[in-house]
């Protein structure tokens, strides 16, 4: 069954801007929250998690990019990149998750 967000996250009104991404339970520092963005060729796609995480100059999350080499799929003829979100510190229940935006500086 498709789940747009990991079970430990939810979307709620944010004091930062509009809607934001919030922890439904405590999350430990270094936790891999999942995929926020995927780039195939020049096209960048964001997941619901990537779409709702708000910017902060003092973020509690960071992203890491992983290159995926395509060797088997004839429909996707290029390698692609996947960005995953990780927590930078322990996150409290109901705390908003934030990230320093850098994607649009690619």
Please name every model-derived segment.
Residues 1-106:
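Conserved catalytic SET/PR domain of SAM-dependent protein methyltransferases, capturing the structural core
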């Amino acid at each position: 069954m498709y789940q747009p967000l990991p079970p430990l996250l939810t979307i709620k009104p944010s004091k930062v801007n509009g809607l934001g991404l919030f922890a439904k339970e405590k999350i430990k520092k270094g936790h891999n929250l999942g995929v926020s963005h995927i780039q195939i060729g020049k096209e960048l796609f964001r997941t619901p998690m990537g779409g709702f995480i708000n910017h902060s100059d003092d973020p509690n999350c960071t992203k890491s990019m992983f290159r995926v080499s395509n060797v088997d799929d004839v429909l996707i003829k290029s390698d692609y990149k996947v960005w995953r979100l990780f927590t930078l510190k322990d996150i409290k229940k109901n705390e908003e998750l934030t990230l320093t935006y850098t994607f649009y500086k690619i």
